[in-house]
């Protein structure tokens, strides 16, 4: 083997939103090199189709792939219309300050797909016997975009993990 990958997912409900936490661990079973690339790691693909209303915005206010692609941010929110409900559905992906590339640059495509991607910054290596850990929280909610609420969720996430 080359890499031992472990994922731990936890789910809870808070303030009318679902919080899905991911802790990803990669242990080098040999020396591993990951080359610079525009994608990699966690990626959230939305049920996009031509003509659907939706938007992506990051924590610094950049919108869509034309403004936010490859840029660093502590969170990214994807919102879109969903058939059968009046409000938009949203998934905010929160970066964690213990992640190696924090704030991580984000891959944001033109079809509302997003993912944090540390290899946007360049090559990285993991030595044999070394472990790297990446943490993210997905906040799933409906209604209008509320950047202040997402920022509170991010601060709570950081404080929880530090206790």
Regions found by a protein language model. Give the residues of each.
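Extended, loop-rich substrate-binding clefts of extracytoplasmic carbohydrate-active enzymes
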Residues: 1-16
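RNA-interacting cores
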Residues: 2, 32-44, 122-134
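Hydrophobic residues positioned within well-ordered beta-strands of beta-sheet architectures
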Residues: 5-7, 20-22, 42, 76, ...
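Hydrophobic beta-strand positions in extracellular immunoglobulin-like domains
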Residues: 9, 25-26, 138
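Acidic (Asp/Glu-rich), glycine- and aromatic
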Residues: 13-55, 149
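Glycine-rich (often Gly-Gly/Gly-Pro-rich) flexible segments and glycine-rich loop motifs
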Residues: 41-83
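Acidic, glycine-rich loop-and-strand cores that form catalytic or ligand-binding grooves
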Residues: 78-82, 86-94
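Beta-strand-rich recognition/accessory modules
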Residues: 91-163
């Amino acid at each position: 083997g080359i890499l031992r990958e472990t994922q731990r997912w936890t789910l809870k409900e808070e303030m009318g939103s679902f919080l899905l936490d991911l802790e990803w661990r990669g242990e080098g079973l040999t020396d591993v090199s990951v080359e610079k690339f525009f994608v990699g790691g966690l990626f959230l693909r939305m049920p996009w189709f031509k003509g659907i209303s939706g938007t992506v915005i990051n924590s610094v206010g950049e919108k869509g792939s034309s403004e936010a692609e490859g840029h660093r941010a502590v969170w990214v929110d994807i919102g879109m219309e969903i058939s059968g409900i009046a409000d938009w559905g949203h998934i905010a992906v929160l970066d964690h300050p213990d992640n190696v590339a924090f704030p991580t640059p984000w891959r944001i495509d033109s079809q509302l797909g997003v993912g944090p991607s540390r290899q946007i910054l360049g090559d990285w290596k993991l030595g044999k016997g070394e472990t790297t850990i990446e943490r993210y929280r997905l906040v799933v909610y409906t209604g209008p975009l509320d950047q202040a609420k997402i920022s509170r969720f991010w601060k709570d996430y950081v404080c929880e993990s530090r206790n």
